[in-house]
Amino acid sequence: MRAAPERLGLLFAVACAVNGAFVPAVAKLTTGRADALLVAALSNACAGLAALLVLGLRRQLAPLVAPQLAPSLLLISALGTALAHLCFYLGASRTSAIVATLCLQVEPVYALLLSWMALGHRPTPRRLAATALLLAGIALALGASAFETSTGVWLLLFTPLCWQLSHLVVLRRLVGTPAVVLSGARYLYGGAMLLALWAVSGTASPPAAELTAMLPLLAVQGTVLGLGGTLLWYEAIARLDLTRATAIVVPLIPLLSLAASFALLGEVATPRQWLGLGLTAFGILVFVTGPAAETRSA
């Protein structure tokens, strides 16, 4: 009886999308006031402290240092938090929130390829066609000049690959590990990695008064948008196949993100961006309405 778990997985996926819709706009707000590396380090440190508190209350700290789990937990922390968030915040600081939103839509392509190569989920012709539509939409929305001149665009395009690689590690090495442990490890270890990188980078921080004023927003960014979103995501992929979960979450985020970008930043998408986003959303809709991925036989 898979109906009930799938319905619950869909609910977690939608909640993850709503949460994620605010990520680009808030990232643009914070990186506009402080260095991107500092924002990444402090927001993830806040998430790490929250994760430590949650795991302590649940008496689940032991798995973080268990010999059979710790290497894989460190790996997903390096990929899915430290590297991904470094690329994301650096990219967001160099582009608009709308461009950041558009770039992240490439994630289903990575999910499709990794699910096929590593998990044996063969792509159907329908999903291949959807991938072509999705990529065409992103290219149309961004335009050729963005790929040629913007380092931020390339950093943002690389970010979802880091996330998908970390998800793959979870599915291959950490099956059965509670979502709260996975999320806690990602932000504890990943936050520590980013703090260490910031400490040795010599990056200047804003004046103490300004930094203090930013801390509440950084805390929300790390704990709610970061840790909360990760918890929701792991609950979703525990009940849905990776490509399907990605294809549900990713199309909802840009539509809601455009509203968040307008509300928080006053950014308005151009007609070209709307057209590209529409094509991308249609491509992902083809993903969502298609059959679940097939697993190759041994």
Residue ranges and their predicted role:
Residues L10-A13, A17, L73-S77, Y89, ...:
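Residue-level signature of transmembrane alpha-helical cores of multipass secondary-active transporters
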Residues R33-L83, Y110-A111, C162-S166, S183-A204, ...:
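Transmembrane alpha-helices of multi-pass small-molecule transport proteins
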Residues A51, L114, P123-G143, L194, ...:
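Hydrophobic transmembrane alpha-helices of multi-pass small-molecule transport proteins
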Residues A15-V18, A40-L42, H85, V99-V106, ...:
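Helix-helix packing/entry segments at the starts of transmembrane helices
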Residues L10-V14, P67-I76, P123-L134, V153-L156, ...:
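Cytoplasmic-side transmembrane-helix entry/capping segments in multi-pass membrane proteins
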Residues N19-V26, R58-I98, L104, I138-L140, ...:
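Specific transmembrane alpha-helical segments of multi-pass solute transporters/efflux pumps
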Residues A25-A36, L61-L64, S93, A139-T151, ...:
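Membrane-interface helix termini and inter-helical loops of multi-pass transporters
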Residues M1-A41, S145-R172, A192, A196, ...:
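Glycine-/small-residue-enriched transmembrane alpha-helix faces in small-molecule transporters
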